[in-house]
């Protein structure tokens, strides 16, 4: 830009160290597969890392691996105990491969999805790791979500419309309505929910459209249970089946979201559901990769 550009790092610019593109990605994958992390742990950690991105000011995201630093490592939504367990396993893998932890977190999420889909998930290396000294903790406090519909998380200390916050989060991530829908349905089908609410599948290790199939099943009658959640009862057997949140049920009550949910719930949309989930997932993982041209 010119000879007078300052050489020092400016903390308000959220600096990130230069990443490494030259390492064996397949070797990293093999090491992750060999560890005892579950699909849910890997996918949820990768989502937690990348989903802080805000298209409005281009802050947050997976680059920098600031999920291992304060304040993000202590956010309730990130399940600090589970997060530290996952990071303790991924750190030595990253160090041995010469990769950044930021890259390895995303690779682990992709490994989880590859286990759940049997398909190859696109990946672009080159993320760097930030240090605590490069991170203005106070400025990152405002990125903490009061709700994350994708993980069925709500901070009970705030009063808000959960569906509106869901739309706000999707907009911050730059997602379209179909992308938001397929990501939420896919995350639930993988058993990812902060408190277990909204898990409507019997096989959480397979990425499927089960969530929307069960949600829209006319045999299920949903009733409030007093804690902001809803219980389904089978009309045919009278048996209580599933518990869901307001965010889950808005995909049945809102006409536009229901249209999307019905499309993905179709028997002939199973492959389309998986393909669209992979595209939307990759979009979020790469949201802050301003160094990528394609």
What role is predicted for each listed range?
Residues 1-294:
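Long, well-ordered alpha/beta core segments of mature domains
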């Amino acid at each position: 830009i010119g000879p007078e550009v300052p050489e020092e790092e400016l903390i308000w610019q959220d600096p990130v160290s230069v990443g490494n593109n030259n390492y064996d990605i397949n070797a990293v994958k093999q090491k992750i597969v060999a560890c005892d992390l579950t699909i849910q742990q890997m996918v949820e950690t990768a989502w937690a890392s990348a989903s802080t991105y805000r298209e409005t000011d281009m802050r947050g995201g997976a680059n920098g691996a600031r999920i291992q630093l304060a304040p993000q490592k202590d956010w309730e939504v990130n399940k600090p105990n589970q997060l530290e367990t996952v990071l303790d396993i991924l750190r030595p893998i990253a160090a041995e491969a010469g990769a950044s932890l930021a890259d390895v977190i995303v690779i682990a999420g992709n490994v989880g999805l590859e286990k759940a889909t049997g398909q190859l998930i696109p990946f672009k290396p080159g993320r760097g790791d930030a240090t605590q000294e490069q991170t203005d903790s106070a400025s990152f406090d405002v990125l903490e979500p009061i709700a994350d519909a994708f993980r069925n998380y709500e901070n009970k200390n705030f009063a808000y419309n959960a569906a509106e916050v869901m739309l706000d989060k999707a907009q911050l991530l730059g997602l379209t309505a179909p992308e938001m829908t397929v990501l939420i349905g896919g995350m639930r089908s993988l058993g990812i929910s902060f408190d277990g609410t909204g898990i409507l599948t019997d096989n959480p290790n397979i990425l499927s459209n089960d969530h929307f199939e069960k949600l829209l099943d006319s045999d299920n009658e949903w009733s409030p249970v007093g804690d902001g959640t809803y219980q389904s009862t089978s009309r045919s057997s009278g048996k209580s089946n599933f518990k869901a949140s307001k965010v889950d049920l808005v995909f049945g009550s809102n006409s536009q979201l229901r249209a999307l949910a019905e499309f993905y719930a179709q028997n002939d949309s199973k492959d389309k559901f998986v393909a669209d989930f992979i595209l939307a997932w990759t979009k979020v993982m790469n949201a802050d990769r301003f160094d990528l041209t394609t």
